[in-house]
Design a protein with these regions (language model features):
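Predominantly extracellular beta-rich ligand-binding scaffolds that present long acidic/polar faces
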Residues: 1-92
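Solvent-exposed beta-strand/loop surfaces, strongest in extracytoplasmic domains of secreted
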Residues: 75-81, 86-194
């Protein structure tokens, strides 16, 4: 008997761009072919994110009226066809505090906050941070140069149609740029008065 996360036994058929939940089933995707390239194991969280399927060339849309955290078939009345639909993944973010020292150049927030695991948590390490941007008081911010404390840095979804950021429960960022110590050498003082 062959058991697989997606297909138990595959003879003379094609399996491509397909997924199974490796959190729920830890075996192979295709029972009689453990290295089959068409059946990829994804975590439960990855299976609830539409980008997983879109990146595999699925015709899928994010639809807030869908309550399923896995893709469902839905009629698209605008385009008169069936499509895959999935609820947008709700995410909370944690930016937290970052400290650096003035170096004469702009310190980019995308360099300081560059790890999706730290920002969205271990279960959402697959989120592409290039689809998000930073804002302060509703204005886009890419970085800061001068020594100062910069508070209330928020993460904003810029182009990820398969995720939404929660309105509450997020931890905004704070960037502290410390002054650089000044080193002075080879100075001669004239006209000294004591």
């Amino acid at each position: 008997d062959y058991v697989g996360g997606l297909v138990g036994l595959n003879y003379y058929s094609t399996v491509s761009n397909s997924f199974y939940d490796k959190t729920k089933y830890t075996g192979d995707g295709v029972g009689n072919n453990p290295t089959h390239p068409g059946a990829t194991g994804k975590t439960t969280q990855e299976m609830s994110y539409g980008g997983t399927f879109k990146n595999a060339s699925w015709d899928i849309i994010a639809d807030s009226s869908v309550t399923s955290l896995t893709p469902v078939i839905k009629w698209d009345s605008i385009n008169n066809k069936y499509v895959w639909a999935i609820a947008p993944l709700a995410l909370a973010y944690t930016l937290g505090d970052k400290t650096t020292t003035y170096n004469g150049t702009t310190q980019n927030l995308s360099t300081l906050y560059n790890n999706s695991t730290n920002i969205f948590g271990t279960n959402h390490s697959f989120i592409d941070l290039s689809k998000y941007k930073f804002q302060v008081a509703g204005n886009d911010v890419t970085g800061y140069k001068d020594a100062d404390i910069y508070n209330n840095i928020k993460l904003v979804n810029d182009s990820d149609s398969f995720a939404i950021l929660n309105a509450s429960g997020n931890t905004d960022g704070k960037l502290i740029i410390n002054k650089k110590d000044l080193t002075i050498s080879n100075i001669t003082a004239n006209n000294k008065t004591y």
